[in-house]
């Protein structure tokens, strides 16, 4: 299974909220996922990014690839 770490969209119309998840690369954006490791709220006064750094490091060590957006969001932490 080729795993990737990416964002799935939650929230309602025009009010996005994203969950950072580990999933199979062949699944749809909002399809099933293996593990949720954090979230991203771009609409807060200061955008909020929270994630479990240990789990992120674990998944990258076993071969999961990060999407461009996840790599950008996690690089600042």
From Swiss-Prot:
It holds the Pfam family Ribosomal_S16. Keywords: Ribonucleoprotein, Ribosomal protein. GO terms for biological process: translation. Gene3D superfamilies: 3.30.1320.10. InterPro entries: Ribosomal_bS16, Ribosomal_bS16_CS, Ribosomal_bS16_dom_sf. The keyword Ribosomal protein applies. One of its GO terms (molecular function) is structural constituent of ribosome. SUPFAM superfamilies: Ribosomal protein S16. GO terms for cellular component: cytoplasm; small ribosomal subunit. The keyword NAD does not apply. Belongs to the bacterial ribosomal protein bS16 family. This is Small ribosomal subunit protein bS16. It comes from Wolinella succinogenes (strain ATCC 29543 / DSM 1740 / CCUG 13145 / JCM 31913 / LMG 7466 / NCTC 11488 / FDC 602W). The lineage of its organism: Bacteria, Pseudomonadati, Campylobacterota, Epsilonproteobacteria, Campylobacterales.
